[in-house]
Amino acid sequence: MNKIKIYLDTSVISYLDQQDAPERMKETQEIWELFKEGKYEVYISDVVVYEINQCSREKRETLLDYLDQIEYNIIETDEGTVELAEKFIDFGFLKRKSYDDCRHIAAAILAGCDFIISWNFKHIVNVKTIRGIKAITTYEGYKDLMIYPPSALLEEEEEDYGSDDKRT
């Protein structure tokens, strides 16, 4: 059986060590365990690598150490990624100032990912962006890309494997 392909934007990796958001940090760490177990096929792009490299030395080293814990594929963005990212702006559901977010989404679509997970509710995980992405993928003939916060993976795991809830 093929594993679900999941694209991680930088916010997911960053929240592994986000002391000022303990609940999201805990959820992200739980999801990271699933990645370490190899339950999903994980993707990041060179945009993620670039954004991590913009962090302070200490934060950058911490995030790279986390990445070393899992298997992942790196998507190299190219002209096709840029063209698709530009369409998101042209269609008006993302703005030019969110260009890197557009590139994350475009990279995930072009790599054939099933999901992109992100803690970025302002630009990625919101109704306007999700509807816009659906319109573009349908119009351009790409596979649908589902966009969720990382916590949705925990909910899926509970459904797949049952919970500890013993209600009858």
Model-found features: residue ranges?
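Generic structural signal for residues in well-ordered beta-strands
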Residues: 42, 74-75, 147
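Short, catalytically relevant binding-site loops at active-site mouths
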Residues: 48-51, 80-82
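Short, well-structured N-terminal submotif of metal-dependent ribonuclease cores
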Residues: 1-44, 53-65, 90-96, 130-133, ...
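Short secondary-structure boundary segments
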Residues: 10, 46, 119-121
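C-terminal end-helix/capping segment
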Residues: 125, 129-146
